[in-house]
Amino acid sequence: MKTIVINASPRKRWNTAQILKSAYEGAKSVGADVEYIDLYDIDLKGCMSCLVCKSKKTEKVKCYWRDDLSPIIERILEADTLLVGSPIYFGKPTSHFRALMERLIFCILSYDDYGSYYKGK
């Protein structure tokens, strides 16, 4: 089982990171293939709303923008399990969490039935 654990906190040793590292160790202890990612270590951008991923000529679930988040999104789509943690600042998750969710969700959302290209996942 492939599991990806993503820390969307800028603080690598505080509460969110501690909880995620505990989950990482737990998954690893039962034999999962686990990858841990700190979002604040990579260069990423949010969705630019260019709609290229919705073009009939574009392969589904491919975001046009290439940055450090692009290969991570591809690995997320191949994974069996995704665990993301973010602290809450001013009532909202961090900007890096939002950027990840915008890029991930928008490119897998089907305008045909407003469902996901990855039904059941």
For each predicted feature, which ranges?
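A short beta-strand-loop structural module common to alpha/beta enzyme folds
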Residues: A32-D43
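N-terminal beta1-alpha1 ligand-phosphate binding loop
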Residues: M1-A32
